[in-house]
């Protein structure tokens, strides 16, 4: 039997991201916040006081006393399996911030636990809920680009002091790897990467990656923690032109290939090559991606429907990120689906 609205929601881990989950749960019609937990008791108390809910230093006490229907797991990646399992065993449906886990084995274990407890597991790939990415997906699905040739994602910026347990690839690449899969509807078959460790003491902090998809497109990925200004760009190149998303401004642009005509290029147009056509900036409805994400999570639970970003989606993004890390270390092309269950 599905629960009824408003659902009781809780947040475990109220750091830089978890605090916003707490806020949004107080704003949604489908949910009300019943408690927060954090190993930093002072931090938990601060957020609990802000939203007028109980605060706990031990997440297990929160789960036992508040019995939430929904739980956001926003703890460090290395704790996702432990905390997520505790929440599932308490009867809660969970949204785990990306990446789903630090290893494929942990991610698989979390998915299996959700299956055994018959609870929803959603992974917080928030970029899918960016209004510009949603619009991009719509236009690509409508065939407005024709065949897709290339997807390029650039996610660079300064080093976030909050990150300690993983490198830039596992922290940031799952966002864009998931976007590439989501927008293209295609699956990567091999990757190659060059990584560098310039400032971070334990992990790589720069990656340049190539991803080849089963259907033919090539993905290019540039991520780092070294750029003094933040850039979040996605471009999708196809036979009729190019879409570009600026995720910071939530803008979507289309640059037309003036030589593309109808379903096929004529022989004359092919000889002329590609030329600049019109540029369109699409008017988009602005909304907060996190609010859309949590709303979709809550609604899936209420409707007893699959969540929009499954545990398998999160696991595939993690597999690809770890394959990029491996390629960066070995300087070899890594085939996906061959020997990566243990990564």
For each predicted feature, which ranges?
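C-terminal glycine/acidic-rich active-site capping loop/insertion
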Residues: 126, 240-312, 334-343
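Short, Asp-centered acidic motifs that coordinate Mg2+ and/or phosphate
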Residues: 35, 69-70, 150
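Beta-loop-alpha module in the N-terminal Rossmann-like domain of NAD(P)-dependent dehydrogenases
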Residues: 21, 51-113
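Rossmann-like dinucleotide-binding domain that binds NAD(P)(H)
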Residues: 160-229, 235, 249, 312
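N-terminal Rossmann-like dinucleotide-binding module
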Residues: 1-51
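C-terminal capping/lid region of NAD(P)-dependent oxidoreductase domains
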Residues: 4, 119, 326-343
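A contiguous active-site-proximal alpha/beta segment in oxidoreductase catalytic domains
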Residues: 95, 101-163
């Amino acid at each position: 039997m599905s629960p009824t609205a408003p659902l009781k929601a809780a947040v475990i881990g109220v750091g830089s991201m978890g605090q916003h989950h707490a806020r949004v749960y107080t704003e949604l019609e489908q949910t009300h916040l019943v408690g927060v937990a954090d190993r930093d008791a002072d931090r938990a108390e601060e957020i609990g006081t802000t939203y007028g809910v109980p605060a706990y230093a031990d997440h297990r006490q929160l789960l036992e006393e508040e019995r939430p229907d929904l739980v956001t797991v926003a703890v460090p990646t290395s704790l996702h399996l432990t905390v997520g399992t505790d929440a599932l065993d308490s009867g809660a449906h969970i949204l785990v911030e990306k990446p789903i886990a630090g290893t494929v084995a942990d991610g698989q274990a979390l998915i299996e636990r959700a299956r055994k407890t018959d609870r929803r597991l959603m992974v917080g790939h928030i970029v899918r809920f960016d209004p510009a990415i949603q619009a991009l997906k719509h236009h690509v699905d409508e065939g407005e680009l024709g065949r897709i040739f290339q997807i390029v994602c650039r996610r660079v910026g300064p080093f976030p002091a909050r990150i300690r347990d993983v490198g830039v690839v596992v922290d940031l690449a799952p966002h864009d790897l998931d976007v590439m899969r989501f927008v293209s509807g295609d699956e990567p078959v091999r990757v190659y990467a060059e990584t560098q460790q310039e400032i971070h003491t334990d992990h790589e902090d720069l990656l340049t990656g190539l991803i080849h998809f089963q259907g033919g497109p090539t993905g290019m990925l540039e991520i780092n923690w070294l750029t003094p200004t933040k850039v979040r760009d996605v471009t999708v190149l196809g036979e009729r032109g190019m879409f570009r998303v600026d995720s910071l401004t939530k803008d979507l642009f289309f640059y037309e290939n003036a030589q593309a005509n109808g379903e096929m290029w004529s022989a004359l147009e092919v000889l002329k090559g590609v030329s600049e056509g019109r540029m369109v900036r699409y008017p988009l409805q602005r909304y907060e991606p996190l609010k859309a994400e949590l709303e979709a999570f809550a609604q899936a639970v209420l409707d007893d429907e699959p969540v929009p970003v499954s545990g398998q989606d999160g696991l595939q993004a993690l597999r690809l990120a770890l394959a990029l890390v491996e390629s960066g270390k070995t300087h070899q092309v890594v085939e996906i689906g061959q020997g990566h269950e243990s990564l």
